[in-house]
């Protein structure tokens, strides 16, 4: 299935240093996946507890609680004094709307758009929404595409561990208090180079080449799911049962490739159809790569849009040992890929050309399943 070990500007979802010094809320178990982030958020005053000391991790976050996190983030990023009436501050500043009032719920997308405003990356988000190919073709972008991509590049999102996949969020999901606490921690620990990561992302808006009719369908379909959560073992945008547990829709890296290139049938204007079902018979990243004959492995310089990509812990081009392959994605062209990975908290568009760090250095080879000329 595969997972990226590094690569982008995301604070690791590991135990925050010094977090153990503060006491955890009484209803946050010692083994809870976000315990350290909750402890940090409460200890730093970014979030609060009830009068009895409970945190209520599974409860929906209120707009007032979200505003409090945003006000602290604004203080951290922009050196603006924190205002106790954070809800009024957030509404007045235009970070969020009043909605159903301070006790109302807030969606992931509205919160992420507020982060975009506070970080001052609105122009990047708006530019990302102009994504188009060289011939003027524009894919149908998911709602909030620019904001969700920008926030991920900045480091404002996270990926829950496999055992907590039921807590992952789509942009339309209502935030729970656990999600809010983890994002508070992310915002309190942004990397020193998050601005350049977001600015560099803008280049994709003018990077896509002209596509054939089939590639417009295939890659347009893939882009439609940008922002979907990373779900270990996930192969569907709909709720799915994985390892005996019912979780929401989402994809791991090979699951996204499987969803786009194997499970779909694409119909062209002339009535002809195409599906990669017969060619892609292996579900995991390792199995996919292991069944690609050496003669069909594609070097970086020969990649074409729609090719399946593989990354390795010991890349040696077409001679890479498949046992070292641990990530996969789909090539968009001109050095860009669309892929689902934990470091990006789901499906993102990423640059893999010169200077791209891990995405460039760990690339092994590609595999072509789309028919030539289509």
Where in the sequence are the language-model features?
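Phosphate/pyrophosphate-binding loop motifs in nucleotide- or prenyl diphosphate-using proteins
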Residues: 45
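Feature responds to low-complexity, polar/acidic, surface-exposed segments characteristic
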Residues: 15-35, 48-149, 158-177, 187-212, ...
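Glycine-rich, acidic and aromatic/proline-enriched surface loops and short helix-turn segments
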Residues: 40, 72-76, 116-121, 149-154, ...
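Secretory targeting and sorting signals
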Residues: 1-21
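Low-complexity, Gly/Ser/Thr/Pro-rich intrinsically disordered linker/tail segments
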Residues: 359-374
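N-terminal capping segments
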Residues: 200-270, 322-324, 338
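Active-site-proximal alpha-helical segments within enzyme catalytic domains
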Residues: 66-69, 111-118, 180-187, 250-263, ...
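...with weaker cross-activation on analogous glycine-rich loops/strands in unrelated enzymes
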Residues: 216-219, 266-349
């Amino acid at each position: 299935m595969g997972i990226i070990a590094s690569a982008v500007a995301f604070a690791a979802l590991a135990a925050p240093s010094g977090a153990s010094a503060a006491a955890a809320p009484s209803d946050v178990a010692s083994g809870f996946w976000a315990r350290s982030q909750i402890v940090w958020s409460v200890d730093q005053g970014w979030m609060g507890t009830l009068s009895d000391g409970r945190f209520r991790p599974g409860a929906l976050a209120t707009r007032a609680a979200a505003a409090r996190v945003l006000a602290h983030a604004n203080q951290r990023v922009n050196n603006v004094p924190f205002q106790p009436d954070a809800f009024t501050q957030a509404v007045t500043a235009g970070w969020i709307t009043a909605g159903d009032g301070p006790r109302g719920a807030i969606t992931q997308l509205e919160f992420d758009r507020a982060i975009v405003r506070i970080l001052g990356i609105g122009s990047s988000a708006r530019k990302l929404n102009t994504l188009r190919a060289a011939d003027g073709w524009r894919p149908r972008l998911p709602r909030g595409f620019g904001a969700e991509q920008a926030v991920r590049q900045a480091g404002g999102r996270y990926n829950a561990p496999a055992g907590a996949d039921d807590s992952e969020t789509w942009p339309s999901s209502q935030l729970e208090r656990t999600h809010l606490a983890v994002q508070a921690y992310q915002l309190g620990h942004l990397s020193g180079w998050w601005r350049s990561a977001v600015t560099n992302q803008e280049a994709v808006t003018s990077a896509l080449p002209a596509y054939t009719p089939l590639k417009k369908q295939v890659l347009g379909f893939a882009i439609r799911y940008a922002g979907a959560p990373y779900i270990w073992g996930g192969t569907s945008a709909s709720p799915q049962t994985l390892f005996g547990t019912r979780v929401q829709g989402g994809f791991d890296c090979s699951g996204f490739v499987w969803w786009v290139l194997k499970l779909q049938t694409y119909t062209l204007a002339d009535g002809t159809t195409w599906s990669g079902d017969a060619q892609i018979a292996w579900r995991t990243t390792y199995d996919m790569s292991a069944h690609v004959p050496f003669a069909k492995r594609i070097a970086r310089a020969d990649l074409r849009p729609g090719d399946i990509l593989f990354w390795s812990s010991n890349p040696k081009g077409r001679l890479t040992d498949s046992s070292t392959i641990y990530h996969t994605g789909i090539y968009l062209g001109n050095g860009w890929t669309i892929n689902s990975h934990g470091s990006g908290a789901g499906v993102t568009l990423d640059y893999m050309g010169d200077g791209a760090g891990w995405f460039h250095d760990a690339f092994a080879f590609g595999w072509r399943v789309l028919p030539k000329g289509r």
